[in-house]
Amino acid sequence: MMTLLENIHVAIPEMIILITACLALLSDLFFRHKLKSIAFYISCVGIIVSAAVSFVFIGSYKLLIFNKLFISDDISHLMKLFIDITVLLSFVYSQNYLDERQMPTGDYYVLGLFSTLGMMILVSAHSLLTLYLGLELMSLPLYAMTAIRRTDSDASEAAMKYFVMGAIASGMLLYGISLVYGATGKLDLLDVANAVAVNWQQQNTLFAFAMVFILAGVGFKLAAVPFHMWAPDVYQGAPSSVTLFISTAPKIAALGMALRFLTIGLVDITMQWQQIILVMALLSTGIGNLLAVIQTRIKRLLAYSAISHIGYALFGVLAASSAGYAAALYYILIYAVMSAAAFGLVVLMSNHGMEIDSIDDLKGLNKRNPWLAFMMLLVMFSMAGVPPTVGFFTKLLVLKALVDVHMTWLAVVGLLFTVIGAYYYLRIVKIMYFDQPENEAIVKIGTGNTIVYSLNCLSLLYLGIFPGALIAACINAFAN
């Protein structure tokens, strides 16, 4: 028992989120009639404390606890920190949106916290068992959150699609894990790696099938082509506050799962999984960018944009070097912050009975709220990869990692798709600044929301001007 509880302190961020979720659930049940937003405040405090602990742990020793089920290292601490930050932003931006539409606010925060707990377990998983446990704990609350607006038929349809596709993906992943366990008799990722190295020649067909099934499951969670079919429909059909949540932190956790499995469990058959990742990365960047160009509805546009960004993150994984893995980690952390800002504007502007649905709803935003338009301009520039925003460095590091391993042709293709992608981001900027507004009313989002949103967007500029600290943290995470 003492051995099991030794070094349990490294799981403090998860414990804080679990306690917070339970407190938010009970307080919403018993005290909601006295203080409507009590679950919101408890959730925010818990997330901030969890983020602070994760930040303090960065740079500490790597530890394996709970009989090697759970790993504590810089990769997990960085991911947990950014998961907490993006979940906090999602909660803050969504508060007024949920209240106005009289949606069950307590349910949203509690489900969000349990999903966050799943994400944190997922990025610290060192066993196939913990990987699957974390994945399901992350996914199941997301299905319920998508259908949280019970009277909305679009949301119910989106939730059903999400659930059915998610169940198929989970089944494929579980089947892949069962094949690995059947072939090796091991669940710990290092033990799996050793068994694969020894038995690959004799059981290569079985391992190949397992790898394909597992990568298919991971591809679904990332919304990478050809497992992306659910993303545009779910992003469009779900309430904007839920789309905001789905588009940020779960992407970090899903890439964390991919990195754990590929860089530890399947490290000896890197050349085999590179072929699958190559196809997924190329198709994601290509199809994501090309289909985003023709979209007129903003949530669908950002869904295809998300698919293309996942493709770029997979380029880093494809490089199969410590620099490539660090670039992929850096990319997904920054993407989550950018996505929180982009969907944050949609949620914050969807007030007073108005729902931001079409790109045309942003027409003339510069005349209606110049500061908000400037913040969104920073987000669009960062997503397009325009210096001095941080989006430039994310793409630069990923493409440099490809060049370093002599995949220059792939870096050129990635650069070409970046140019195509810039078109639809700049189209939004053009609409905000040069088109006449259809509604002349001033856009007001409240002082608190303006401050938080400004910090979110200005961080993209700050990290672009001073990128060194975060890049160094990502490189050190894989160097160790």
Swiss-Prot record:
Cellular component terms (Gene Ontology): plasma membrane
Membrane topology: Multi-pass membrane protein
Biological processes annotated in GO: ATP synthesis coupled electron transport
One Pfam family linked to the record: Proton_antipo_M
InterPro entries in the record: NADH-Q_OxRdtase_suN/2 (IPR010096), ND/Mrp_TM (IPR001750)
Protein's name in the database: NADH-quinone oxidoreductase subunit N
Entry function: NDH-1 shuttles electrons from NADH, via FMN and iron-sulfur (Fe-S) centers, to quinones in the respiratory chain. The immediate electron acceptor for the enzyme in this species is believed to be ubiquinone. Couples the redox reaction to proton translocation (for every two electrons transferred, four hydrogen ions are translocated across the cytoplasmic membrane), and thus conserves the redox energy in a proton gradient.
Subunit organization: NDH-1 is composed of 14 different subunits. Subunits NuoA, H, J, K, L, M, N constitute the membrane sector of the complex.
Substrates-to-products reaction catalysed: a quinone + NADH + 5 H(+)(in) = a quinol + NAD(+) + 4 H(+)(out)
Molecular function via GO: NADH dehydrogenase (ubiquinone) activity; NADH:ubiquinone reductase (non-electrogenic) activity; quinone binding
Localization, UniProt: Cell inner membrane
Transmembrane intervals: 11-31, 38-58, 69-89, 109-129, 163-183, 207-227, 252-272, 276-296, 301-321, 329-349, 373-393, 401-421, 458-478
Keywords: Cell inner membrane, Cell membrane, Membrane, NAD, Quinone, Translocase, Transmembrane, Transmembrane helix, Transport, Ubiquinone
HAMAP family: NDH1_NuoN_1
Organism in which the protein naturally occurs: Legionella pneumophila (strain Lens)
Domain of life: Bacteria
Catalytic activity, EC: 7.1.1.-
Family per similarity comment: Belongs to the complex I subunit 2 family.
